[in-house]
């Protein structure tokens, strides 16, 4: 696994993706595959600007366990309060082992992810040309053994790989209803992003 060195705009050209909703987006070219910065603490200084992580509290007993995923208007869901202009959507996705779902990005929508079964390798990439972390990559391992919820702002590319031998389930909130025009895509194996989806420790 290569140590991640953030390219500089002076020595690496950026591939423009256009401006949407006032956000100028681009891909900052890399030449070596990388996991970027692996995030091991919710308050890591290496987090992409605007990305937030909050550990979920698990309350086990002899019947099973209880976990509160979100309180609308509180915590990471502080801005996810429905009103006349904001329509909140909650979704559940199940993904088979080894499947990669990436790279998605939005110019308007904010996502709040909570993997509720299995483990996922979450990929995040800052596409925002004027962000202080433009071009940065984060890798986050979350799910059963690390119950975190992850807030992903507009302009941050995202995706995940289902780890292990069982399907994973991911619950996610979005701060607006599904809008096909804001569902933007980049190939999961885009050569200029150069994210390393392979198993690292064999």
Q: Model features per residue range: what roles?
A:
Residues 142-165:
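Conserved metal-binding segment of the jelly-roll/cupin
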Residues 2-145, 165-202:
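Non-catalytic, conserved peripheral segments adjacent to functional cores
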């Amino acid at each position: 696994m290569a140590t991640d060195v953030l390219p500089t705009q002076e020595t690496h050209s950026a591939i423009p993706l256009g401006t949407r909703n006032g956000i100028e987006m681009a891909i900052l070219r890399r030449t070596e595959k990388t996991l970027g910065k692996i995030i091991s603490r919710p308050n890591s200084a290496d987090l992409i600007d605007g990305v937030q992580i909050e550990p979920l509290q698990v309350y086990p007993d002899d019947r099973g366990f209880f976990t509160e995923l979100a309180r609308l208007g509180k915590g990471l869901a502080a801005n996810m309060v429905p009103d006349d202009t904001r329509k909140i959507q909650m979704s559940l996705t199940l993904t088979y082992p080894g499947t990669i779902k990436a790279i998605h990005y939005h110019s308007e929508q904010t996502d709040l992810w909570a993997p509720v079964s299995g483990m996922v390798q979450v990929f995040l990439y800052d596409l925002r040309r004027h962000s202080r972390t433009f071009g940065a990559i984060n890798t986050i391992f979350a799910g059963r053994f690390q119950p975190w919820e992850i807030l992903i702002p507009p302009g941050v590319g995202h995706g995940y790989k289902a780890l292990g031998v069982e399907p994973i389930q991911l619950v996610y909130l979005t701060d607006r209803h599904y809008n096909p025009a804001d569902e933007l895509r980049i190939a999961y194996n885009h050569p200029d992003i150069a994210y390393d989806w392979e198993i690292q420790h064999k």
